[in-house]
């Protein structure tokens, strides 16, 4: 009797496993077929990149495409911590630990030379009508120095090089890729630490050519909070630095012509409240539209700094309330700010007009909560497609 009982249980488990396996494979194959359709991107308004963290093995992730009705279309990947996506108007580019994906009229998958576990930046390579990517690769195998691998295409050939430093922040203008490296020195007498930063410019062709443009010092350790943005021969980015009793949130100004670094305080906060004001996005917390530098903090306040006068002010507050440690992704396009609220209860995509400060659209997303309930993944990037 017991043998029959255990046999029935075993058969039930096998049948259930087969059904579950068939269902998962069948669902995934349908998604891939849909992505191969020529008009898949036609009604898609955004893509959100989800992934497990680097300490989760095996890795898992999703590129979640959202249509104009708020329906979510998840494409499963192997995941990439701090992964992101790029769009050149026709093609979406994203990655996981081992593969590059391009999606336009069809989905193409290309395997890289070695696994990468932490993303850093993805951008368009206008010279070759393709994309490039930078990874936070880690310490060199010989233990000497740090490495950030960069991948690109030249004449349809895959290329790779290594930037021999950890990237503090990065940005792009046309064919130029800008990166900042940092170094710390400690005074042997008083133990005081001082910080030196260097700005590098990389151009991609048959080979990658990287040169140092300028360097500068900072008495305190700043934390970059955004990509760099080019405007009128200057690079601007957001950072924060903690003093004795307060923290400053600053716009850093790198003058490419005169090789000088300056900063402008946007707002200050008490030291113990710093974490509450730290922005939610990993890299997309700042934006330039016309002659204004915009930023958003962790409490939903949007500020602007006039690049002509240097004056800063609070423009408006986000209508939807959220907590400092909620998952909120950010993107910008011209004079619009986009916010993706990412929860297991209800997710939504909101659009704000930077000129008026008004929320002009809210699109509730359907289907994301199932992904979050079944998988321990986190959102790392929002990309607006239209």
Feature-to-residue mapping (PLM):
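N-terminal "mature head" segments of proteins
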Residues: 1-131, 143, 385
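Hydrophilic extracytoplasmic domains
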Residues: 18-23, 32-51, 104-105, 255-386
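Repeated scaffold domains used in trafficking and secretory/extracellular systems
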Residues: 29-39, 76-90, 116-129, 161-176, ...
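Short beta-strand elements that form the blades of beta-propeller/WD-repeat-like
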Residues: 39-57, 82-102, 122-144, 170-192, ...
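Hydrophobic/aromatic beta-strand positions that recur at structurally equivalent sites within the blades
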Residues: 61-68, 102-106, 151-153, 200-204, ...
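Short coil/turn linkers that define WD40 beta-propeller blade boundaries
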Residues: 70-71, 108-110, 155-158, 205-207, ...
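Short, surface-exposed coil-to-beta transition loops
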Residues: 145-146, 195, 223, 324-327, ...
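Acidic, serine/threonine- and glycine-rich low-complexity intrinsically disordered segments
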Residues: 163-324
């Amino acid at each position: 009797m017991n043998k029959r009982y255990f046999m029935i249980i075993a058969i039930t488990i096998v049948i259930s496993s087969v059904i579950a396996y068939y269902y998962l494979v069948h669902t995934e194959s349908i998604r891939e077929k849909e992505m191969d359709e020529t008009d898949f991107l036609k009604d898609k308004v955004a893509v959100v990149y989800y992934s497990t963290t680097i300490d989760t093995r095996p890795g898992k992730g999703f590129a979640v495409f959202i249509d104009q009705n708020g329906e979510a279309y998840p494409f499963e990947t192997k995941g990439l911590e701090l992964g992101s996506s790029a769009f050149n108007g026709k093609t979406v580019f994203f990655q996981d630990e081992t593969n590059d994906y391009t999606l336009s009229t069809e989905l193409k998958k290309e395997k890289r030379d070695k696994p990468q576990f932490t993303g850093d930046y993805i951008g368009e390579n206008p010279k070759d009508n393709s994309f490039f990517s930078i990874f936070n690769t880690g310490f060199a195998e010989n233990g000497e120095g740090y490495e950030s691998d960069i991948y690109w295409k030249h004449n349809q050939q895959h290329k790779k090089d290594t930037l021999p430093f950890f990237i503090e922040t990065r940005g792009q203008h046309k064919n130029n890729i800008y990166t900042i490296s940092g170094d710390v020195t400690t005074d042997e007498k008083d133990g005081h630490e001082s910080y030196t930063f260097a700005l590098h410019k990389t151009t991609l062709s048959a080979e990658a050519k990287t040169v140092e443009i300028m360097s500068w010092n900072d008495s305190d350790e700043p934390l970059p909070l955004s990509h760099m943005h080019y405007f009128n021969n200057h690079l601007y980015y957001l950072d924060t630095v903690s003093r004795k009793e307060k923290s400053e949130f600053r716009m850093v100004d790198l003058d490419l012509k005169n090789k000088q670094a300056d900063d402008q305080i946007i707002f200050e906060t008490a030291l113990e409240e710093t974490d509450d004001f730290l922005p939610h996005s990993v890299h997309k917390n700042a934006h330039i539209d016309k002659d204004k530098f915009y930023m958003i903090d962790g409490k939903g306040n949007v500020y602007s700094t006039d690049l002509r006068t240097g004056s800063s002010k609070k423009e408006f507050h986000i209508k939807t309330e959220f907590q400092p440690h909620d998952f909120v992704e950010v993107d910008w396009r011209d004079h619009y700010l986009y916010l993706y609220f990412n929860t297991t209860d209800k997710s939504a995509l909101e659009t704000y007009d930077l000129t008026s400060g008004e929320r002009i659209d809210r699109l509730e997303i359907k289907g994301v909560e199932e992904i979050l309930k079944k998988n321990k993944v986190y959102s790392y990037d929002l990309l607006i497609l239209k």
